[in-house]
Amino acid sequence: MKNVKFYICPHCGNIVEMVNDAGVKPFCCGQKMQELVPGSVDASHEKHVPDVKVSEGAVEVNVGSVNHPMEEVHWIEWVQLVTDKGSYRKWLNPGEAPNVKFLFGEEKPIAVYAYCNLHGLWKNEIN
């Protein structure tokens, strides 16, 4: 799969994933959206970087080597698995555990992204 890019609107907070990058940044609320760069916010890596376990046809993700808080004001909104054939996203809610399991066919997992509502986008590349 091509390089995955996410953008956020600095005005309203909308987030989009670039499906086909033709070189033009997306617009929202009358202005250019800002690219979300994984790990660019000064925050605890041990609570944000996805901890990934790969097994035959499955990827288990725990957000953080130390569980990320899942409170009404601070939580992981979603986790996304990127493979060589596409991607899978799961949404989380406050109060839930910050872990998910993805089941897939004969695809090769490439990376996992996690989005914190306060500290932005985080990524772990799978070797």
Regions found by a protein language model. Name each.
Residues 6, 25, 113:
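Residues immediately within or flanking Cys/His clusters that coordinate Zn2+
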Residues 117-125:
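Short acidic/polar inter-strand loop motif in beta-rich domains
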Residues 9-12, 28, 116:
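Short cysteine-rich clusters marking metal-coordination/redox-active sites
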Residues 63-71:
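Short amphipathic, basic-aromatic surface patches that mediate peripheral association
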Residues 22-33:
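Cysteine-rich micro-motifs
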Residues 62-63, 98-105:
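Exposed aromatic-hydrophobic patches
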Residues 108-118:
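Short, aromatic- and glycine-rich surface loops/edge beta-strands on solvent-exposed regions
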Residues 18-22, 36-39, 124-126:
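Short Cys/His-rich "knuckle" micro-motifs
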